[in-house]
């Protein structure tokens, strides 16, 4: 049983992250370490519950935790008020109060919604993230962003609310289909592009081990991704400045998700395309070379990620991006890569021409 530990340092709201293979049974140990409440709601979807619900229930029960499952539908299209109401209803029906806790067991949708329910129920109850997808393990479970979608845009209703603990068992990644695994790799690759060229190169060197989901390779990749995100969150918890770089590829990616009705593309797939568009914009602004754009494209394609934007009009893309929550006073704030391993946030006054030129590259 391999276990790596790290801490997200946020003063009184600091919390540990455990990363390993076969560590699911050690969740009660982690709960005790952070003095988690004994009465727990486990928010999950039917598929994840069928895979891991019994193991979790056995571990909690054997350690004296009173637990209740609240089942919610999976999928980005269900990350809405109706599903949030289902969680509230379950908490109220089971008599939960401020001295109870919540575990979000599942992927990013479950983590975002479980976290937002915890942030808002009785003005806040403690929660723990147990992410079971690669995307959730390296992105949404770390940093305290919680949210639901609005018909006009993604994650428009949310709160910053840090978990007490994040419990990452990479063995859960063996159950993912190839497409779901790839969508998580998009976010892993993002960290290399924006902050760590050596990690970017490591991902390419270890591509075969990652593709076959070797436990050691997965632990190393997830740990480094979490370290990079934690270091950024520690400096800028609420995205006043530095944390915005985590949105590399996301402005255009969210536009793709919105225009496709959250149906055609998974989040990481949309972000992969968004990163390619951002890289071409960066190239147009002489922030990176054509070879570096090619290296980004090559690594994304290694993991079978899409790199070509869908055929929506430039006007549709611009309108969707203007609804992005990162727009300030009508100006787009784009994260652009400076080569590989560094980036900057750039306000774009006239995005139409820049994006028109970038889209011509596809």
UniProtKB/Swiss-Prot annotation:
It is found in: Cytoplasm. The keyword NADP does not apply. The keyword Cytoplasm applies. Keywords: Amino-acid biosynthesis, Aromatic amino acid biosynthesis, Cobalt, Cytoplasm, Lyase, Metal-binding, NAD, Nucleotide-binding, Zinc. Binds 1 divalent metal cation per subunit. Can use either Co(2+) or Zn(2+). Its EC number is 4.2.3.4. NAD(+) binds at residues 74-79, 108-112, 132-133, 145, 154. It is an enzyme of class 4 (lyase). InterPro entries: Dehydroquinate_synthase (IPR050071), DHQ_synth_AroB (IPR016037), DHQ_synth_fam (IPR030963), DHQS/DOIS_N (IPR030960), DHQS_C (IPR056179). GO terms for biological process: amino acid biosynthetic process; aromatic amino acid family biosynthetic process; chorismate biosynthetic process. SUPFAM superfamilies: Dehydroquinate synthase-like. Pathway: Metabolic intermediate biosynthesis; chorismate biosynthesis; chorismate from D-erythrose 4-phosphate and phosphoenolpyruvate: step 2/7. HAMAP family: DHQ_synthase. This is 3-dehydroquinate synthase. It comes from Syntrophotalea carbinolica (strain DSM 2380 / NBRC 103641 / GraBd1) (Pelobacter carbinolicus). The lineage of its organism: Bacteria, Pseudomonadati, Thermodesulfobacteriota, Desulfuromonadia, Desulfuromonadales. The gene is aroB.
